[in-house]
Regions:
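Structured beta->alpha junctions
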Residues: 22, 57, 81, 115-116
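Pocket-edge positions in alpha/beta enzyme catalytic cores
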Residues: 10, 21-25, 81-84, 156, ...
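Conserved RecA-like helicase motor-core motifs
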Residues: 72-82
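Short, surface-exposed, polar/charged, turn-prone segments marking secondary-structure boundaries
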Residues: 7-11, 80-83, 103-106
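Proline- and acidic/polar-enriched loop/turn elements at helix boundaries
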Residues: 9, 52-53, 79-80, 143, ...
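Conserved helicase C-terminal RecA-like lobe
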Residues: 47, 61-73, 86, 93-214
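Helicase P-loop NTPase motor core
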Residues: 1-74, 97-101, 133, 158
Length: 214
């Protein structure tokens, strides 16, 4: 290649020497980091607040966060958001909660218009009123409104809700034969979630896609 040879040096030769650890996997790497942190704290050489872990992309934090949480090591993400608190991750988790429990109205409310489906606030207010009057979940209320000939919803609203209902029922059926991982992939692709992010064509959207692939 055309890369120039480099010789790295420092004027400050005090302190610990750099240690290179070649991990077998991402999880092995995260465990090594956690082991080193616990060793430093146990030896009273450092406090947790003295330790920093640098990584190249936000998506790389997931496995490290999991290991730190499992070890009971408290941490703070600087200049970013914890993996499971990122919008795209919360969206997919809400989809999965809804798929495994269609009567989870809270999760349904989060994903009903994600990606954008053109389901407006007025439409959802009517669906919520139906759910309250019938004493049922939002999903059952949507089904009732779509199938009712006396629905107060506009034909357009019934159409977009019907499309959502079709997608939701397909995903609910798929859960019988799919692992959670495969189902999550189907959610991202089948609902158009990834396609919407790709259409944004921004650095932020690319980062979100990378997080989802993680």
């Amino acid at each position: 290649s055309g890369r120039k040879e480099k010789k790295l040096w420092t004027e400050c030769d005090a302190g610990e020497k750099i240690v290179v650890y070649q991990a077998e996997s991402e999880r092995d790497e995260a465990r090594y980091i956690a082991d080193e942190i616990q060793s430093l704290v146990a030896s009273k050489k450092d406090r947790l607040g003295d330790v920093a872990v640098l990584y190249r992309t936000n998506a790389q934090s997931r496995i490290l966060e999991e290991v730190l949480l499992n070890r009971g090591i408290s941490y703070k993400i600087v200049g970013g958001v914890r993996f499971y608190e990122r919008k795209e991750i919360k969206d997919v988790l809400a989809y999965l909660r809804f798929i495994y429990n269609p009567d989870d109205s809270s999760s349904l409310s989060r994903i009903i218009n994600v990606p954008r489906r053109g389901i407006g606030e007025l439409t959802m207010n009517k669906v919520e009123a139906t759910a309250a009057s019938m004493g049922v979940s939002l999903f059952k209320a949507i089904k009732a409104e779509v199938e009712s000939e006396d629905s107060l919803l506009s034909s357009r609203a019934k159409k977009v809700l019907g499309d959502f209902l079709h997608t939701a029922e397909e995903l609910i059926e798929l859960k019988k034969d799919m692992s959670v991982t495969k189902l999550a992939e189907q959610v991202m692709l089948g609902t158009g979630y990834i396609a919407e992010l790709e259409a944004e064509n921004t650095i932020e959207a690319a980062g979100r896609i990378e997080n989802l692939k993680e």
